[in-house]
Amino acid sequence: MIEVKRDDFFVESIKNPIEYGTYYKINPKYGTGFQWTSEVHHDFIITATDIRFNQETMVGEHIGSGYVLALYISGAGDEFYPYQNISPNTLRCYEPSEKYKAIYHPQIPLRCITVQVDQEFIDQYLQEISGDLEAVSYTHLRAH
């Protein structure tokens, strides 16, 4: 088994075939594949991953400052904290700053789409709509 070191996981940024985001090629010592990332107004980060690991690979990190919604299209492995099996069509939500550790199995493509939503954006949005909801509720109550 090999453990991924975040400072050498991506070896280069590759030419982007579309005008948005950045493509990264992974280090051949871990496998083959790429990751595409696009940040939208500092509120959302969208990532598409297509990687095939060479051997059992452990990945560990902390989730960023926002909520992450991940759809695993294909893949095989195990996540810890809490334990969950990674298999095709798995949908997972990670909390901000959640500890993350997973083991991915080799030669099975890990295809995943994630959307990270900034916590501050969520808080601001909920505050805005709660004020609107209070005004609507108050108006509705007065009318009856």
Language-model features: where?
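N-terminal regulatory/effector-sensing and dimerization cores
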Residues: K25-S137
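OB/S1-fold single-stranded nucleic-acid-binding modules
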Residues: I18-Y24
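Short Lys/Arg-enriched alpha/beta "domain-start" segment
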Residues: M1-K15
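Conserved small/polar residues in nucleotide/adenosyl-binding loops
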Residues: T139-H144
